[in-house]
Amino acid sequence: MNLLYRDYPQGALTSLHCHEGPQFCYLHRGGGVISSEGTGVLLVAGQLCLIPAGLAHEFRVLRHSQLSLVYLDDLDGGGELTIRQVSPLLVGLFDRLADMAEPGLRDAYLTVLAAELRQTPAATGFMLSAGLDVRLLRVLEQVCRHPSIEYGLAELAAGSGASVRTLNRLFSQQLGCSFRQWRQQVVMGRARQLQQQGQPLSRIALELGYGDFSAFSHAFNRCLREPAGP
């Protein structure tokens, strides 16, 4: 087992590459698209992706991102990109290991992490059915840069080069969800990140565009009860 950390600036694009063994990618913060020929997954903060061995892929960074990359050679990663469920234990392990230096304790945590990853089930996620349309990409980049519940598709369409109707179609065809479903996932991912940084929920609600704290509280509590995914 090998655990690495990567930090990618907004707008970065890795070259097409593959790995000898399966790779788990956990996104601590940020947002981006992992794509291979004909398919891809859209990752937001708090999500986990499994990349099979030998699958050529690239990572397009929509927002400054920090990732944990785990390589498990003795795992059957299947043949396709998949989103995996993220339990509270996995979140805690990834976050704790990010600053852990003591070798003995770190090895113990890695053993638990490997065991959890081997049994984590598949989850629903934002799967890209084809190459990402550049007009949709502009919308994804804007919302990932500054997550807010206040974004409306009419506002975003003005800078995307597409009509609201076209963007609705692209969300449905390429992500399999509505704009509102995707926006909510991005906003709640950012909320989880800010909470882990110790910020009070009232401040988080304001930063994410909620004028009604009770509406934010309801959405956030529902998010915490569900595995990371749409």
Residue ranges, per PLM feature:
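DNA-binding recognition helix and immediately preceding turn/loop
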Residues: 132-178, 197-208
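N-terminal regulatory/effector-sensing and dimerization cores
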Residues: 1-83
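Short hydrophobic/aromatic patch on the recognition helix
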Residues: 46, 167, 171, 215-216, ...
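Sequence-specific DNA-binding recognition helix
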Residues: 195-230
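Amphipathic alpha-helical segments enriched in hydrophobic/aromatic residues interleaved with Lys/Arg
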Residues: 77-144
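Amphipathic alpha-helical segments enriched in hydrophobic/aromatic and basic residues
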Residues: 178-183, 224-228
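Short, basic, alpha-helical segments at the C-terminal edge of helix-turn-helix-like DNA-binding modules
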Residues: 183-192, 230
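Short, Lys/Arg-enriched N-terminal segment that forms or immediately precedes the first helix
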Residues: 8-11, 120-128, 168-175
